[in-house]
């Protein structure tokens, strides 16, 4: 009689699943953390709600109203969740039949689209971007049959560039009546003029993902948003957990989205952009750096000679970057989060010392 193990009892797709390799999961013993696109210094808040004996609101009113005002949409067009990652998953759960429907995304891009779909048992289709990392619209059109959700990250992680708005319009026309198009705007605060939030009235099948993890400097809070038309939001409300945000999270999020909080965020963005330009200019002069790509975000993608050796050398010095070698078309590439001036200087000095 064969013995059935606990692993045998698990779903086949979970047994075969490779979990998302988050920056924290990859570990390291660094003191210069430039691998997760976090803000480099902590922001401070005081808790104002002393009601931890009560369950929180499912969709905290102050958070929703503040975010709607900030994003220029109606409160009915906002859903708050445990990070934008939960929003990615909710869209698949609401719109995709496991074993029947598919999602589509365009690598090189963020890894959670595929992990969320595979966890739920939904097929993943990929259409790699063109050489300039823009959308291959013909390739997408050819693979749309049976696709219910299309994910497009703009600005794209890890490449750092915006998707051409005209290509977004073409994609939205291609998918009208067929699929939800999700614009992942996790980094939009660094290029706010490029947001698609103003397009919601025109495209009922558009959804937009946002987060407080980047420009708002609250990665540890785990608070994200989905912006969409009310019909989409109502469907997502059916599948979200009853209490997605704890009371302290909602309390701090509402403060971060106050008028003073928005001003502080914009000051942080200006500081990071200035530091990004300083770091880009320095990287271009370093012998082991082959190419530095333009960025609209708080990180820089660069191609290195002997990138694996460079990555390990900096790792051993306590400078933790993100290796992108396994991503399509990113051979030799490392991603560097823009940190403080001191952190930038540590990176620059370490790279200058590399004998490649």
From Swiss-Prot:
Under SUPFAM superfamilies, the record lists: PLP-dependent transferases
Q: Does the keyword Metal-binding apply?
A: no
- EC id: 2.6.1.9
One term of GO molecular function:
pyridoxal phosphate binding
Q: Which Gene Ontology biological process is one annotated for this entry? A: L-histidine biosynthetic process
Q: Does the keyword Nucleotide-binding apply?
A: no
Pathway annotation from the record:
Amino-acid biosynthesis; L-histidine biosynthesis; L-histidine from 5-phospho-alpha-D-ribose 1-diphosphate: step 7/9
- UniProt keyword terms in alphabetical order: Amino-acid biosynthesis, Aminotransferase, Histidine biosynthesis, Pyridoxal phosphate, Transferase
Disulphide bonds in the chain: none
What does the record give as cofactor?
pyridoxal 5'-phosphate
Q: Which residues carry this modification: N6-(pyridoxal phosphate)lysine?
A: 214
Catalysed conversion reaction: L-histidinol phosphate + 2-oxoglutarate = 3-(imidazol-4-yl)-2-oxopropyl phosphate + L-glutamate
According to the record's subunit comment, the protein's assembly and interactions are: Homodimer.
Task: Give the matching HAMAP family.
Answer: HisC_aminotrans_2 (MF_01023)
Report the sequence similarity comment from the record: Belongs to the class-II pyridoxal-phosphate-dependent aminotransferase family. Histidinol-phosphate aminotransferase subfamily.
Q: What is this protein called?
A: Histidinol-phosphate aminotransferase
